[in-house]
Each structure stands twice: as structure tokens, then as C-alpha cells.
Regions:
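Hydrophobic, aromatic-enriched alpha-helical segments typical of multi-pass transmembrane helices
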Residues: 1-27, 33, 37, 41-160
């Protein structure tokens, strides 16, 4: 069941901003971060904020299946991968959903600081997921998946 949670979380997280943007006049994917969809000024704020909390919960709910699939092969790497996923889920998901940013960056509140710190820590942790997946893949003899994951990690580092 956890694999379905992962697929649902990834798919909806990619689609939802594009589905919500038309309902927020003036919102631009090019000029604004997705978090603005959850700002107090946004007409779709509740949908987006509830989604972020649900995203975090879905990702955390997927971790038992990750452990079942890889924990017996490499408990340390699997534990690190689960930790990285949970830090992202709680920081960029749950905390970001509970505490909103303002549409105007000049206005800083305690909520926007919590949102920012949670998101930064979450995405920083998630940046290491492809490296951990690569190590797990190489350990299992899946060289192609390992190389692909290393390429993703390299792109991640270059673009972060």
C-alpha cells in the first residue's frame, strides 16, 4: 500500500499547482514559488495547505513499505533514506502546510519563518535521496538504476 502512497504523493504534488493556479488570478509559476498558493491572500489556500499536510502524511505512511523492501538488505542505508523522506515530509509537507508564507516576500511573520525553515530543511534532506537510492541500487547489483540515481543526484546538486 505504501508504494501507492508514494505514487499518489509524487503525482499529485506535480499536478496540483498547475490545477490550482488558474483559480488564483495573478499567480505566475515563473515569478512566484508554489508556497504562494497557500498564502493568506490566495483563493485556493485551504486546498493547497491541506494538500501539503496530506503530502507529508502520505510520504510518512509509505515508509514501512520502504523498510520492508530494502531494510533487510541494508538497514543503515534504508534507515537514512526513510529519515530523509520523513524530514522532507514533515518540513516541506506538514510544517509548510500548517504555516503559510505571504504573497509579498517583504512581509515576514513567524509563520512564514517556520514555513521557510521547514521547507529548506525538508528540501535539503530530500536532495540526498537519489544518492541513497544509488547506493542501495549498487548494493543490490542494479547498476543501471544506480547510475541513473547518481545522475539525478548530480543534477540535484547542480540545480540546488
Amino acid at each position: 500500500m505504501g508504494w501507492y502512497f508514494l505514487l499518489a504523493a509524487a503525482g499529485l504534488d506535480l499536478l496540483l499547482p498547475f490545477l490550482l493556479a488558474p483559480f488564483y488570478p495573478g499567480y505566475s509559476h515563473r515569478r512566484q514559488v508554489m508556497s504562494v498558493l497557500g498564502s493568506p491572500e490566495s483563493p485556493v489556500r485551504w486546498v493547497y495547505r491541506v494538500w501539503l499536510v496530506a503530502l507529508g502524511l502520505l510520504l510518512c505512511a509509505a515508509t514501512p513499505d520502504l523498510w520492508a523492501a530494502f531494510g533487510n538488505r541494508s538497514p543503515v542505508l534504508t534507515g537514512l533514506l526513510i529519515a530523509v523522506l520523513c524530514v522532507f515530509a514533515l518540513g516541506a509537507g506538514v510544517l509548510a502546510g500548517l504555516f503559510s508564507v505571504n504573497a509579498d516576500k517583504a512581509v515576514e511573520t513567524a509563520a512564514s519563518r517556520i514555513h521557510g525553515v521547514g521547507s529548506v530543511l525538508g528540501f535539503l534532506a530530500l536532495a540526498f535521496a537519489p544518492l541513497l537510492v544509488a547506493l542501495l541500487a549498487f548494493r543490490d547489483g542494479a547498476g543501471g538504476a544506480g547510475v541513473f540515481s547518481l545522475i539525478c543526484f548530480a543534477l540535484d546538486v547542480c540545480c540546488f
